Amino acid sequence: MASNVLNRYLFEDLSVRGELVQLDEAYQRIISSKDYPAALQKLLGELLVSTTLLTATLKFEGSITIQLQGDGPVSLAVINGDNEQKIRGVARWEGHIADDATLHDMMGKGYMVITIEPKKGERYQGIVGLEGDNLEQVLEGYFERSEQLKTRIWIRTGEHEGKAHAAGMLIQVMPDGTGSENDFEHLEQLTNTVKNEELFTLPANELLYRLYNQEQVRLFEPQNVEFRCGCSRERSGAAIVTVDKNEIYDILASDGSVSLHCDYCGTTYSFDESDVNKLYEEAASEPKTLH
């Protein structure tokens, strides 16, 4: 069974490239960090697939963040991924969300922000309205406006054998492509036939053969996708010592401990008075850096 993997492929005779992402554990880690409503779990899965497909286009070390903001019950949904396919995500909501809520039911009047941050170089940010019925159409609109390349995206979420899965495919005309409009439409029609179970379970080579067995498809080396939030007890301790000391000891006096919660993975780090004393002692003993 295919899981937590990104595959890139090329239609050699048609100047069209493709991507296939298949996620289970990475998706499950994100939606298990909070008691997300079913529709919001689905939206996070779609956003996760979208971000992974986008990070596959990175030709440098860096990260991409796709963020949805709106005035509906869901005020924020965000997924961050990097060129190594380390991903994390979180959403914020208020009130009841129906199981069959749509993108617009959840976000209301909103927009999508795509932020590309190279480790070296300038940060880029693009903002698009939530135009279209779903995230597929919003993202296709972004590609056509920003890259001016014909792009089609398929995103699916659901359960297989009792576990949550998210998967997606992308096909896009190459910038120097010589293929015809009919070629691209033909590939669209073939990809439209893909079934959820195939996307969730089949290895890339088998799935691509089922869809495109009459085409010359070159499949590149796969890349693993992994949930990684970046939190740690050490980072939490470092954050505590940046806060006013009196404020920290006031919290200790009233609550008995200072706690920091990671929204991405759901872990809570607690520090009692002896822990906090040790943090400040270690901070005081560190050599000062002169600027």
Curated annotation (Swiss-Prot):
CDD domains noted in UniProt: Hsp33
Keywords, ordered alphabetically: Chaperone, Cytoplasm, Disulfide bond, Redox-active center, Zinc
Listed GO MF terms: protein folding chaperone; unfolded protein binding
InterPro entries, A to Z: Heat_shock_Hsp33, Heat_shock_Hsp33_C, Heat_shock_Hsp33_N, Hsp33_helix_hairpin_bin_dom_sf
Main location per the UniProt record: cytoplasm
Superkingdom: Bacteria
Disulfide bonds: 229-231, 262-265
Presence of keyword Oxidoreductase: no
Keyword Disulfide bond: yes
Subcellular location: Cytoplasm
An example Gene Ontology CC term for this record: cytoplasm
Pfam family name, one: HSP33
Gene Ontology biological process terms in this record: protein refolding
Signal peptide: none
PTM (free text): Under oxidizing conditions two disulfide bonds are formed involving the reactive cysteines. Under reducing conditions zinc is bound to the reactive cysteines and the protein is inactive.
Function (record text): Redox regulated molecular chaperone. Protects both thermally unfolding and oxidatively damaged proteins from irreversible aggregation. Plays an important role in the bacterial defense system toward oxidative stress.
Family affiliation: Belongs to the HSP33 family.
Protein name according to UniProt: 33 kDa chaperonin
Organism: Vibrio vulnificus (strain YJ016)
Lineage: Bacteria, Pseudomonadati, Pseudomonadota, Gammaproteobacteria, Vibrionales
